[in-house]
């Protein structure tokens, strides 16, 4: 058993004998069921630094979204010396460390693909280095090049037509959460020793492919840990030893995260479940008189300020999929332990309070792990912050805990992952609505008129017959699932080979659990289309070649989103059927196949490439996002809509079921107290049914319209809204995506 003087006052034994942060937390945290009255406002230092950062953000927006970009230096742990928000204010920064040498400057990260790194530069008027072009074209292979070299014609066609899209073949896959708490608890030197033990015990001497690969990966992880020490030394910090107080705990943890974002540009670079862990250090310092509540809040404010600054260089096609510059620095608060104790601490309040001290913001992606059993005071405070900022999402701790335990993190938008025990292979999503059109047209793409799917017999009748459509759809779905898994197997293999996440994996157990994440787009439109075919009459409109290009619906039909089992059960069937088709395939590194109903803002892109559907949706218009009902389908109010989504079993979509709802403030009540109580009741009722996720927006459409027309108004500079799985500054969305948000249902009544 190891022991450090920095651990004085901490209880427990197992976490001292092995890397086990959960055991440390369970033995040492202090649950809090009081209210928010203890919270402190922003310090003078916080106001000055946040003011300087807001000025930079304003300059960034004026320059078209990018303040500065690197063109000559390849990002790495030690590529840069120290950087600060403002050199003249650097002594005020309680938490230090930037991705590059300047605030909001975007790093050059070519290992995912040199073409992408260069295109990101030229898009914003920067000239990339000719020398780096030569190195990463002639001498070094990148992930992107390797993937496209290996793609089959069928894979390229599916990608081109957007029946599969958003694939991590032009950017880092992300969704891997290093257990950044380990840096604070153990220090780097101890973590290196643990990894060296793993290396010594890797294999039995027989050099199989798996053993060779794992030995190389562990060696790279050890190298990354050593690099983290050097990175921290540039800021005058020695992270070789455990953190001795709250400030060091916050700083050491942040250095672990900084290592990840300096070396990877994944679509989701989550922070993880850190609030209760850090509260242990803060509580110890408060009790021994070395920290005040104001200083504690300042630490959290400054840490969150750093998370708000994370930036990556992106290409236009990426921004169409994931609009508004998100990084998914997802950070969780709340939850209930396996022993039944609330895991709400004062620090959970402090993280939510950053939205009051520094105003609303999309990052970090603050996530409440919700249960109706959480302390009432905390539920009301979270509801209050939601109502005032629209910056918080909620996920059901009661359905996730049996699968992932009580120390999981959210690794992107809505996907759970065991912190420090697991990694996820991110896999974007398949267009199940377009797949229905392929079934009707025998694999011919309705937009390009080319044979992109298998040449099955098309449906030629004037009216669609449910008993004919369904088996053809199942057949086409099975083809799509098989192709989808093959594409992802190829991508994940190449990512491990050419863009391995050693800094993150160094902070995860060597014997790692792997999940294989897939996703569904167009979910509600498939439900309503099949319902229309089954319960109404759907006439096919064909072009001169006989291709189905439109549909006329005669009569009414039940729609998903109205608590009508006739429609909702189609959704349950669709989810289970697709998951079973995915799970029967071989997955890379024997990972566990999961799926999600989640689109991010790619619902707009998917819609652009998908023709008219039998539910009445017009050709090439946006899909409804995530698991949301189709636009205009919800006729019975918010609660009926929530009830429909809640029927989808989480255990068939362990990668997450995203639901985003907008509520007019008047629908929740006429006073702050009434609104808080009503929102808590909505959340309790929704999650007690087994629902997984809810984004909560509280505003009227009038505000959105005014923000779209007058983005220059000061009140809209940080106006944040929740979209499918994340938050975004509304004025950072494209006009098209703003219109899509405005077209969604805004519930005027519960």
Predicted regions, residues:
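Conserved catalytic cores of very large enzyme subunits
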Residues: 2-750
């Amino acid at each position: 058993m190891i022991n450090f003087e920095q651990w004085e006052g901490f209880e427990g034994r197992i976490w001292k004998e092995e890397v086990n942060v959960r055991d440390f937390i369970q033995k040492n945290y202090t649950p809090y069921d009081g209210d928010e009255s203890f919270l402190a406002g922003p310090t003078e230092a916080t106001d000055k630094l946040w003011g300087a950062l807001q000025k930079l953000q304003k300059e960034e927006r004026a320059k078209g979204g990018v303040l500065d970009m690197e063109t000559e230096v390849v990002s790495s742990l030690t590529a840069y010396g120290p950087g600060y928000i403002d050199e003249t204010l650097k002594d005020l920064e309680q938490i230090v460390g930037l991705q590059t040498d300047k605030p909001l400057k975007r790093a050059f990260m070519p290992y995912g693909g040199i073409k992408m790194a260069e295109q990101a530069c030229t898009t914003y008027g920067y000239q990339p280095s000719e020398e780096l072009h030569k190195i990463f074209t002639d001498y070094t292979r990148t992930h992107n090049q390797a993937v496209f070299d290996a793609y089959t014609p069928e894979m390229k066609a599916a990608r081109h037509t957007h029946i599969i899209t958003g694939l991590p073949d032009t950017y880092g896959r992300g969704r891997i959460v290093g257990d950044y708490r380990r840096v604070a608890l153990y220090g780097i030197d101890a973590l290196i020793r643990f990894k060296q033990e793993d290396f010594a015990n890797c294999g039995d001497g027989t050099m199989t492919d798996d053993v060779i690969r794992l030995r190389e990966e562990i060696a790279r992880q050890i190298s990354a840990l050593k690099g983290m020490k050097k990175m921290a030394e540039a800021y005058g910090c020695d992270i070789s030893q455990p953190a001795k107080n709250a400030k060091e705990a916050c700083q050491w943890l942040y250095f672990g995260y900084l290592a990840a974002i300096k070396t990877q540009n994944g679509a989701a670079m989550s922070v993880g479940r850190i609030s209760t862990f850090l509260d242990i250090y803060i509580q110890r310092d408060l009790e021994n008189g070395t920290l005040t509540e104001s200083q504690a809040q300042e630490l959290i404010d400054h840490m969150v300020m750093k998370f708000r600054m994370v930036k990556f260089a992106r290409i236009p096609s990426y921004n169409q999929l994931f609009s508004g510059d998100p990084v998914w620095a997802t950070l969780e608060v709340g939850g209930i332990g396996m022993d039944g104790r609330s895991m709400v601490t004062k620090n959970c309040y402090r993280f939510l309070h950053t939205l009051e001290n520094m105003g609303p913001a999309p990052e970090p992606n603050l996530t409440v792990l919700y249960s109706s059993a959480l302390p009432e005071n905390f539920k009301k405070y979270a509801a209050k912050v939601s109502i005032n900022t629209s910056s918080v999402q909620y996920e059901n701790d009661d359905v996730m805990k049996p699968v992932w335990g009580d120390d999981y993190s959210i690794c992107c938008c809505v996907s759970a992952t065991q912190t420090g025990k697991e990694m996820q292979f991110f896999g974007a999503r398949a267009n199940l609505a377009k797949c229905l059109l392929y079934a009707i047209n025998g694999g011919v793409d309705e937009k390009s008129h080319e044979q992109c799917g298998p040449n099955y017999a098309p449906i030629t009748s004037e009216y669609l017959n449910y008993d004919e459509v369904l088996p053809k759809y199942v057949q086409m779905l099975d083809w799509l699932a098989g192709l989808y898994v093959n594409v992802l197997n190829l991508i994940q293999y190449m990512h491990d080979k050419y863009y391995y996440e050693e800094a993150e994996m160094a902070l995860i157990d060597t014997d790692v659990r792997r999940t294989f994440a897939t996703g569904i787009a167009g979910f509600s439109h498939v439900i309503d289309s099949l319902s229309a075919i089954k319960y109404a009459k759907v006439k096919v409109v064909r072009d001169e070649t006989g291709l189905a290009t439109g549909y006329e619906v005669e009569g009414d039909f039940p729609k998903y989103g109205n608590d009508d089992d006739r429609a909702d059960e189609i959704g349950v069937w669709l989810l289970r059927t697709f998951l079973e088709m995915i799970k029967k395939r071989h997955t890379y590194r024997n990972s566990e196949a999961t799926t999600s109903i989640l689109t991010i803002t790619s619902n707009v892109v998917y819609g652009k490439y998908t023709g008219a559907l039998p539910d009445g949706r017009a050709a090439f218009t946006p899909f409804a996002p995530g698991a949301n009902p189709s636009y205009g389908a919800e006729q019975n109010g918010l609660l009926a809509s929530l009830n429909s989504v809640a029927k989808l079993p989480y255990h068939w979509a362990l990668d997450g079921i995203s639901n985003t709802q907008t509520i007019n403030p008047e629908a929740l009540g006429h006073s702050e107290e009434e609104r808080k109580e009503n929102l808590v009741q909505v959340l309790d009722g929704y999650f007690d049914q087994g629902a997984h996720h809810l984004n909560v927006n509280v505003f009227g459409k009038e505000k959105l319209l005014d923000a779209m027309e007058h983005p220059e108004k000061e009140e809209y500079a940080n106006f944040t809204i929740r979209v499918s799985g994340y938050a975004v500054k509304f004025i950072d969305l494209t006009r098209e995506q703003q219109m899509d948000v405005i077209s969604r249902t805004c519930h005027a009544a519960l």
